[in-house]
A protein has these predicted regions:
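Alpha-helical transmembrane segments in inner-membrane proteins
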Residues: 1-336
Length: 336
């Protein structure tokens, strides 16, 4: 009975996500009717139908909104997945993908390249620079946190916060001293957004989220044990430090990939796992797929709000998620 209910929940969430993805494509400064969106998708994917819509509508839907929607779904899924496993290995309900210092490293890399190097490889310049910065930040955090060959999760989180503050201070100083026209572009990226979405940029985040999901599902049993406490994990014959290190590495690499394209989008990794646990409990083989679907669903609709609330301007999506996340946790605390 429980397995049937879980399967029905996955089917319902999957169907809701699919419908949401299609419907969301109609929203924006230029509204496109849902029936036109549907016909454009059928024509571009399967070759069905004869194009009887405006060329501008096809350009907006297929080249701008579909990549943006897919990137939003991938980023939402990835951040929710990372948040769930970090909360498990740290046993901290407030653990978040950005606590590892990866986001600040990505920000610093982006600031340095945009202000002092320029677009040496076109549109890919900012994502590549951000990913390199994220990797360097991750390595610095791991080097500082590693003491006598041992990696403690509390020490790692503290090092992540410390490195994050230092790197953000350097990035803000460079922005203050740099060209203000270039700084404005970096500032919008720092606030989080999906404006960099292009078809050619989707393969890497898609691969990282899919591979991360497969690897973390394979670690569901150790994650369950760590949630129950380190003594339980040791009793079951697990090496808790090794499990934590693997999770931190996977989470850091995934965060680096996602943040390099979308900028800093907060609260998804904090909020979605709490909602998912209320639906299916804390068993990670059941929890992680639900987190992926809920994270995608959440960010797809937040992006709709971001591009319609102050149209024709784009509201930075990180601002929207922060506002929603703050209200969510106020409600959560009042309910306890």
């Amino acid at each position: 009975m429980i397995n049937r209910r879980y399967a029905l929940l996955l089917v319902a969430l999957g169907a809701l996500l699919l419908v949401s993805c299609v419907v969301s494509l109609g929203f924006g400064p230029a509204r496109v009717p849902v029936d036109v969106v549907w016909r454009i998708l059928l024509h571009k994917i399967f070759g069905f139908g004869v194009p009887d819509w405006a060329a501008g509508q096809e350009h907006i839907v297929w080249l701008i909104r579909v990549p943006r929607m897919l990137l939003g779904a991938l980023v939402g899924a990835g951040l929710a997945l990372i948040g769930a496993v970090l909360q498990a290995v740290t046993r901290n309900p407030l653990a978040d993908p950005h606590l590892l210092g990866v986001t600040s490293g990505a920000t610093l890399g982006a600031v340095i390249v945009v202000l002092h190097v320029g677009e040496i490889v076109g549109l890919l310049t900012l994502p590549i620079a951000a990913f390199i910065g994220a990797l360097l930040s991750m390595l610095i955090v791991l080097m500082i946190a590693n003491r006598n060959g041992r990696l403690d999760s509390d020490r790692l989180l503290l090092c992540g916060v410390a490195v994050s503050f230092v790197m953000m201070a350097i990035a803000n100083l460079l922005l203050f001293l740099g060209d203000h026209r270039a700084s404005s572009a970096v500032m919008f990226w720092m606030l989080g957004g999906l404006g960099l979405a292009r078809w050619e940029l989707l393969a890497v985040p898609a691969a990282s989220v899919l591979l991360g999901l497969v690897l973390l599902l394979g670690m569901a049993r150790p994650l369950n044990a760590l949630m129950a406490g380190e003594q339980t994990a040791v009793t079951l014959g697990l090496n808790a430090r090794t499990v934590r290190l693997r999770v931190f590495l996977i989470a850091s690499l995934m965060t680096g990939v996602l943040v390099s394209i979308s900028g800093s989008i907060g609260f998804v990794g904090l909020m979605v796992p709490h909602i998912a646990r209320r639906l299916v409990g804390a068993e990670h083989r059941r929890l992680l797929p639900v987190c992926v679907l809920l994270g995608s669903l959440f960010l797809v609709w937040v992006d709709v709000a971001a591009r319609t609330l102050i149209a024709p301007e784009d509201l930075p999506i990180g601002v929207a998620t922060a506002a929603i996340g703050g209200l969510f946790f106020i409600g959560l605390m009042r309910g306890r």
